[in-house]
Amino acid sequence: MIFDKYTLKKTQLRNRIVMAPMTRNMSPGGVPTQDVINYYERRARANVGLIITEGIEISHDASSAYPNVPRLDSDASIDAWKTLVNGIKINDGAVIGQLWHCGGFRKPGMGPNPEVPGHTASGLTRPGKNVAHAMSINDINETIDAYAEDARICEKIGFDGIEIHGAHGYLIDNFLWEGTNQREDAYGGSIEKRAKFASEIIKAVRAKVSKDFIVGFRFSQWKQ
């Protein structure tokens, strides 16, 4: 069964082998290098049916926390992603881009916007550790818009879909987890309220892309 073809929405997969996202830290300035492009092409040539890329930091000032992580906020990065996606497609692979906001993992002085602090639901990076910025409603709305716009760009580039990274203690998971979400507004309290941020991101993304564009959501109880 693992080698059988599979159809996901309108995306034809040659088999059911899926490569999970793995951070590479090989994209200086947010631009995937030729080595990164070659890395993904080799996996497609080796008959991986569906590749989920490493995390792509969304185009938001506070999204980054690690060096040399790819982005979508420049012509150079978009051109590199086009080359990368085309390299997978010509080798009969399918590709989903993982969209990522690192939230409270962002350290003071981290580029590309060193003056911007890490963002979290209520200032907590873990229970009892208050070292980050508690997001305002405006911050939340800007972040939702950034996810949706980058999903639109991914579809325009040629990705088959996107995966929203909602796991491992990063921003969305920080809202989901009651240990770090101590908000007293519409985004905190019950599990339904803590999930509101994630739900609004998914809805905003879905509204910006076509009905056959794959939209996935990654979640996990494991924390980074």
Language model features by range: what are they?
Residues 1-102, 143, 151:
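N-terminal capping/small domains of soluble enzymes
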Residues 20, 98-100, 165, 218-223:
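Short beta-strand segments
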Residues 49, 160, 215:
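Short acidic/polar active-site loop segments enriched in Thr and Asp
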Residues 52-77, 99-112, 163-189:
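Glycine-rich, proline-tolerant flexible connector loops at the mouths of alpha/beta enzymes
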Residues 68-96, 178-215:
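Alpha-helix-loop-beta-strand connector modules within alpha/beta enzyme cores
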Residues 84-88, 139-164, 198-208:
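An active-site-proximal structural segment forming one wall of the substrate-binding cleft
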